[in-house]
Amino acid sequence: MAVQDEYILVTGGAGYIGSHTVIELINHGYKVIIVDNLCNSCYDAVARVEFIVRKSIKFFKLDLRDKEGLAQIFDTFKIKGVIHFAALKAVGESMKLPLEYYDNNICGTITLLNVMREHRVKTVVFSSSATVYGDATRFDNMIPIPESCPNDPTNPYGKTKYAIENIIKDLHTSDNTWRGAILRYFNPIGAHPSGLLGEDPLGIPNNLLPFLAQVAIGRREKLLVFGDDYDSHDGTPIRDYIHVVDLAKGHIAALNYLNKINNSEGMYREWNLGTGKGSSVFDIYHAFCKEVGKDLPYEVVGRRTGDVLNLTASPNRANSELKWKAELSITDACRDLWKWTIENPFGFQIDNYKWKLFNTLGIMDYKNRLHTICFQDLEVSIANYGALVQAVRYKGRNLVNGFNDFSRYKLKENPFFGATIGRFANRIANGQFEVDGHLYTLCKNENNKTTLHGGNNGFDKQFFLGPIARQYEDYNTLEFILVDKDGNNGFPSDLETLVKYTIKNNSLEIEYKSVIPEYSKLNVTAVNLTNHSYWNLASPNKTIDGTIIKSTTNVYLKVNSETSLPTGDIVEWQNDITKPTKLDPNISFDNCFIVDREASKFCLDTRKYSLKNIVEVIHPSVPVKLVVSTTEPAFQLYTGDGNDICEFQSRSGFCVETGRFINALNNEKWSKQVILRKGEVYGARSKFSLYAQDLEENKHFLDSASYNSGEYY
């Protein structure tokens, strides 16, 4: 019987501190389930966590007060422990909405603890707050604040945290096998050093540095300093600012501490998580301005209700017992926050971008979403599944074959609509290849003779992580990543592949980058990537007959008629397709045309080359021209004669699959196009540009040369 995986359930795992803690959990070998109702966070943070750790994470959109839904998660998965972040958390807001805070924070926790008790899960790390101490300066000897400082929170937020601490304490008193770690954190700041993850407050930021960051990029006019008449060196309040990564690691240290306790034993203990060093508001202001490179505008206003002079931690207990210590400085935090801010000036709120779940009917699974970038003229939709292009709409006209029902993409008859093809596009002879004296046998998924498009579990049938969505002045990007495991379909080595889509008002560019990661046990593999979109300028559910195609090359790889594999010869096409060629039922293509036949130019990463136009396409009745360009040495032109699925029949679309030579890895002269070793980079770029032109321009295109006609297939 297989051993069931154990999970740490993280409530509020899509939030600022929760998401950073999930990263540290996974980096320390834990499997994680996130539960979050997304009321003051968004799923994009989870997608970015997955991108950073290169692993899929189970996620459930759920309010903790939903006992039935929460219990179902505990029924389904083996939960080993819980890290509890989920809470409303704004001090000022809690003064205005006390009932909402008590209901959400306390009632949600009680429901969680009840479900845990019913499922015999008795390990909880609670993300509390230094606000439970209230104004510690009312005592002469309590700064820095020790855990023994009397508790007297001054606002509803702090009172909910203190109430939850006592609930967990009383639970342990009633059953001493419970293990509760109470982490009283001070002021988290900073962002993940990758620049991919940071605090993204919905609305006006409540915390100092996020607000200051928005001032720095022009989203806010000035910083509001709440009081400069405190008894401090510059009159502003003092706080213990801790880098969010250090804070996240403190939660791992607490969890590890609890896990070392014997199963029959329990404990309840509070720890401060802070640096032990206090900084005033102006200290932080000047540190951040130094990182930005200029002074930022600010205005001193009145004190904020509930604020106190000094909240500096004494972290000695955590240092000694948890073997944890804050290592990162204020400078580190300001640097990481500024990187996050300039790379994500609007956080996760991206103009021209929206997404929705893209699942089989009745299933709610966040690992597959449909991401749409929409400009005035061009709208492109891309799914996590296969990083596939589901729709390309230019001036309201859809130009590619695709399904609105996700389940159809999983049909056996699906001819790879819109998919990213990998790890190796097109055919591999005999389903095998040899490198460094080792023969690798692959999945033979075409007539049990050849490997086609990477095998039965190619990139087209896997869920890519991400995307990282970004906006720029006149374009948007979506970056997806996939980790293809060593041995999948027989291919050696782990492989990390980044697919980056760049969408402008009239173009879709696709960039590929693949590397063998350092952790891979093997150090060589074969790679050839492409996109398998079927284009139809007239109408995606009609035939492409009447479409006019013009290529910049007329040479192709001659193939064996029985195997569809290259003979090794590069020959001229029997009719000149560098002249406009009108498609009709007698003109069919499934051939690899050569853009660059010079072996001296073969390389793994072609991104350094300029894009070359390779194909122009029009339809006489449609005022649109498609131009395909690439850095690649070849492209497969396919007219989709064998397609027959749902509303899409034979010849419902044509493909221009840019890439390397067919079966290049089994040809000594061509193999360096596709053999990737650890430390090297495979890369490629292709672009699909769309132009509006009137029908008279189409006529000129046709008149530029007499178009070909004849039987090509």
Curated annotation (Swiss-Prot):
Its cofactor is NAD(+). It is an enzyme of class 5 (isomerase). It comes from the Eukaryota. Keywords: Carbohydrate metabolism, Galactose metabolism, Isomerase, Multifunctional enzyme, NAD. NAD(+) binds at residues 7-38. Pathway: Carbohydrate metabolism; galactose metabolism; Carbohydrate metabolism; hexose metabolism. Disulfide bonds: none annotated. Its EC number is 5.1.3.2, 5.1.3.3. GO terms for molecular function: aldose 1-epimerase activity; carbohydrate binding; UDP-glucose 4-epimerase activity. Pfam families: Aldose_epim, Epimerase. GO terms for biological process: galactose metabolic process; monosaccharide metabolic process; UDP-galactose biosynthetic process. The keyword Transferase does not apply. It catalyses: UDP-alpha-D-glucose = UDP-alpha-D-galactose; alpha-D-glucose = beta-D-glucose. Residues 351-713 are annotated as: Mutarotase. One of its GO terms (cellular component) is cytosol. Residues 1-350 are annotated as: Galactowaldenase. The active site is at 532 (for mutarotase activity). InterPro entries: Ald1_epimerase_CS, Aldose_1/G6P_1-epimerase, Epimerase_deHydtase, Gal_mutarotase_sf_dom, Galactose_mutarotase-like, GH-type_carb-bd, NAD(P)-bd_dom_sf, UDP_G4E. Mutarotase converts alpha-aldose to the beta-anomer. It is active on D-glucose, L-arabinose, D-xylose, D-galactose, maltose and lactose. In the N-terminal section; belongs to the NAD(P)-dependent epimerase/dehydratase family. This is Bifunctional protein gal10. The lineage of its organism: Eukaryota, Fungi, Dikarya, Ascomycota, Taphrinomycotina.
